[in-house]
Design a protein with these regions (language model features):
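Cleavable N-terminal export/targeting peptides
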Residues: 1-35
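Short glycine/proline- and aromatic-enriched beta-strand/turn motifs that initiate or cap beta-hairpins
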Residues: 26-89, 236-245
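Predominantly the C-terminal beta-signal and adjacent terminal strand-loop region
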Residues: 32, 106, 192, 197-245
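Residues on the lipid-exposed face of transmembrane beta-strands in outer-membrane beta-barrel proteins
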Residues: 41-43, 85-91, 101, 134-140, ...
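Repeated loop/turn-to-beta-strand initiation elements of outer-membrane beta-barrel proteins
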Residues: 94-97, 146-148, 202-206
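Helix-adjacent hinge/juxtasegments
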Residues: 125-128, 138-145
Length: 245
């Protein structure tokens, strides 16, 4: 009988401790679930604008349209991976503001399409583009932020870019030389997006997002490029992960 009483007392103490631990844990879960801030990370793929939609005076178009001095590459070669992060703040149940930063960089090898060295070797270059967008967005959540959360949004981006061409080139007199042409700077443009988030437990969400950006870097003729602009626009398809708090 004494043994049973001791077991019962131990069981009661254990139950009370579990209940005491469960109360603040439940309160914390409730607080997190209703939290309106989130830190997010994304991993995706950037599709550069194609030949038919690139801005006039685009340097890539210029490189492809020099007749016998044209370079051989595809615009699609500039498609590549992106990654980034963002901070979201809920303004109410149906609106949230976000600030984020992303990173994209791609190096594309090219050669002269119709010109080679006297010994038959190709005349090669590396074309490299880097884009770092800093964005501010407002998003509309049509069914609220609880459970599965679809959203659409728009905003503005400040785009840091760097474009370079490094390798061997042919000058106006037909001589081959080694050169390096670089242009970097900042430009601004609109961003539109849409996506959906799915809850995982009480504090995490995963989802997908489609984003479009429109911007162009200018002043490339100052650095002796063949075109004065570099089109930075295109679509990004992203996998997203967020931690709510």
């Amino acid at each position: 009988m004494m043994r049973f009483r001791q077991v019962l007392q131990c069981g009661s103490v254990t139950a009370l401790l579990a209940l005491a631990a469960a109360v603040p844990a439940h309160a914390q879960v409730t607080r997190v679930d209703s939290g309106r801030q989130a830190i997010g990370f994304n991993l995706g793929y950037f599709n550069a604008k194609g030949l038919d939609s690139r801005v006039d005076e685009d340097v890539l178009l210029a490189n492809l349209s020099q007749g016998q001095f044209s370079l051989a590459f595809d615009i699609d070669d500039f498609d590549g991976a992106t990654f980034g992060g963002e901070w979201l703040i809920g303004l109410n149940d149906y609106l949230e503001a976000g600030v984020g930063v992303d990173f994209y960089q791609k190096t594309v090898p090219s050669v002269y399409d119709q010109k080679v060295r006297d010994d038959g070797r190709e005349i090669a270059q590396d074309l490299k583009l880097r884009i770092v967008p800093l964005t501010g967005t407002i998003r509309f959540l049509p069914i609220g932020r609880h459970g599965v959360t679809p959203y659409v949004g728009a905003g503005i981006g400040a785009f840091n870019f760097r474009y370079s061409e490094v390798g061997e080139f042919i000058d106006n007199d037909g001589f081959t030389f080694t050169g390096r042409f670089i242009k970097s700077g900042w430009t601004a443009g609109p961003v539109v997006l849409g996506g959906v988030r799915f809850p995982i437990g009480d504090v995490f969400t995963v989802g997908g997002e489609l984003r479009y950006q429109k911007a162009e870097g200018k002043g490339l003729l100052e650095e002796d490029f063949l075109g004065d602009k570099i089109d930075l626009g295109g679509w990004s398809t992203n996998f997203t992960f967020h931690l709510r708090f």
